[in-house]
């Protein structure tokens, strides 16, 4: 009796254990199915993936377009800056060229003026060949020559001191008659011409090499006045 009861109990326990095990297996299987179903349902389809890819490309495309547009603008700005720089350089070069041309013309003008200076004072003078001596090539006389003015006052007497005011005014009269500036002349001789109010000087024009002998006379309160110029041989 006891053996039958013991076998019965063991069989019952095994049956219960199998039941529990089957239940657990069923639960696990259900969970697996549920999880698999969720994964399958939630996984993106190929169409969705394609749409997402297209959307991403569209979003990136404007950015790329903006980048390309910005790059083009940068290139245009760079070209504009380069063009402006070249224009400024050309303007500066043209300006420098004009300045150089102007300076060159001025130098040429000064040179021409220096070359022609000896003729300016003699332009309207009456010219005769020869003169008071054999070494005179031409004689110039002009009744329109004026006294050159003076800063001296009182009674006048010619002074042949190269540092005196009278000497400076005599050279001024010689320069006026010949057209040779005092800076461009070499005084070969300057002295009395027969009276305290008459003088004569010989000069060399540094620019042309011409020599002139000039006769001058004193006019009260008006200074020295040239009366005759002789070009020497």
Swiss-Prot record:
Biased composition (Basic and acidic residues): 48-57, 66-108, 135-144
Pfam families linked: DUF1510 (PF07423)
Organism: Bacillus subtilis (strain 168)
InterPro entries: DUF1510
Annotated GO CC locations: plasma membrane
Cellular localization per UniProt: Cell membrane
Main location: membrane
Protein name, as recorded: Uncharacterized membrane protein YrrS
Keywords associated with the record: Cell membrane, Membrane, Transmembrane, Transmembrane helix
Transmembrane feature ranges: 21-41
Keyword match Membrane: yes
Topology of the protein relative to the lipid bilayer: Single-pass membrane protein
